[in-house]
Amino acid sequence: MDMTPTDPTTGSADRQAPPDGTIGLRESSDGRVRLYASSFADLMEMRAPAAVVGAYLDRHEGWFRRCAAPMAVEPLGANGYVLTLGRFGNFGFEVEPTVGLELLPQQEGIYRIQTVPVPDADAALAALYDVDFNASLRLDQADAGPDRGLISAEEVDRLMAHTLVRWELDLSVWIRLPAMITILPDPLVQTSGDHLLRQIVRQISRKLTWKVQEDFHASHGIPCPPRRRARF
């Protein structure tokens, strides 16, 4: 699929390179370049000790590709993936951002996902958009406590050792807009783009956390707890 949009002012594909051929969109002084950013936080309850949840997350080559669907995922090295986030655009201008991600090894119960370069990336697309994807999963184990022997049978399942996985995602997208869009009121262009990105971040996070939670419990033969409301 050709993701290079047409510039309404010229009728041709907008393939303008950065001003000096090397400066990326993040450092560009081009007035058409817009930054849209959004954050999201959520919580997954896993009915297993943190060590079991950690062992599952360590094997990301299985769960990440399964749970990221329907987003397109391709492997990138030993710990990375190329992820297509879905369509993002404003006022008829659309791109389908693709980003390289690296899943870093656990450090003190925290897993981090960071942006890495995509090899052989299309230079024309790199002149249109840039993505910074930073996420973390923190494992917090909650135990039944010292009075477990005093609880009723009905409470055992509720109070069994379980782990809370706290998910946070910060996503920033830089886009070089067609000149036609920049004649619109500045606040309108910014707020509409921010709103759309919030929807995308929310959708990515909700689907990913739900699927990881369901996949973990299914793979361990454990009943999956009900979904929690998202924390925005």
Regions found by a protein language model. Name each.
Residues L125-D194:
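Beta-strand/loop substructures that line and gate deep hydrophobic ligand-binding cavities in soluble
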Residues D2-E96, E102:
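Hydrophobic ligand-binding cavity/cleft-lining segments
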Residues S39, R66, L83, E96, ...:
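Extended beta-sheet lipid-handling architectures
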Residues L76-A78, E94-T98, Q106-I110, L128-N134:
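Short connector loops at helix/strand junctions that flank enzyme active sites
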Residues D2-P5, M71, D132, P146, ...:
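N-terminal intrinsically disordered, cationic/polar leader segments
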